[in-house]
Structure formats: structure tokens, C-alpha cells
Amino acid sequence: MIRTIISIFITFALIVTLSVYEMYYVHTTFRDYTEILQSLYHKTELQTATYEDGTSIRAFWEKKKHRLHVWIPHTSLQEMDYQMDEALGFLYQQKYEDALPKIEVLLGIAETIPHNYTFGIENIF
């Protein structure tokens, strides 16, 4: 009986600890990604963004994405890849007006993903 109760408490503590870590990691990763995307958006508005700016953001995303796959479904992260690839294509061609909406979509997705997978009553029911 005592072992069962101890096992239940240990399991509960592990679940809570992993949940807190997951929320922290996802939120900080997307916060950092949003800040980087906002700087790219600003540079694109000024038409000073380069393809290299975009590839450095993609490198950041690729590094973080592998760990995010543990917490977030593949389809949510895949949409980020598609939008980033299109934005990079427009930056490569220096079509800044076409790149801006793609970066806006990336900013929107980066804002909604953490909220969709955060522990909250609206995500339970």
C-alpha cells in the first residue's frame, strides 16, 4: 500500500515537472523565434532584408524544431517550414512585398502554437 502511494506521488511529480518544462521550453523557443521574425519583418519592410538573413532564421528554426517535435505535432511545425521556404524564395528574388505576408503568417503561427498546446481549461474541453 505504501509503495503504491509513493509510486503514485512520484509519477504525479514527474508528470507535473515534465509539463512545466514543456510549457517553459515551448514558450521561450517561440518567444525567441517571434523576436527574430519581427526583426526580419522590419528589415523586409525597409527592403534591406537579405536571403542570408532568412537562412540564418531558418538555421535557428531547424535547430529548435527537432526538440519541439517531442512536444508539438509534426503538422503544426510543418506549416512553419512551408511558410519559411516561401518567404525565403521571395527574399532571394528580392520581392519584399510578397515576402511580407509570408512573414506575417509565420508570426501568427508562432503566436498561436504555444497557446494551442498550453495547459488550460479551453484546451481540455
Map each language-model feature to its residues.
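Short, solvent-exposed, charged loop/turn and helix-capping segments
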Residues: 60-78
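Non-transmembrane, amphipathic alpha-helical segments
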Residues: 18-25, 49, 72, 76, ...
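Alpha-helical transmembrane signal-anchor/signal-peptide segments
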Residues: 26-43
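Amphipathic, well-ordered alpha-helical segments in soluble domains
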Residues: 32-36, 53, 60, 83, ...
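Hydrophobic membrane-insertion alpha-helices, especially the h-region
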Residues: 4-21
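Structured, soluble extracytoplasmic/luminal domains of envelope-associated proteins
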Residues: 75-125
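Alpha-helical segments in soluble extracytoplasmic regions
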Residues: 38, 42-65
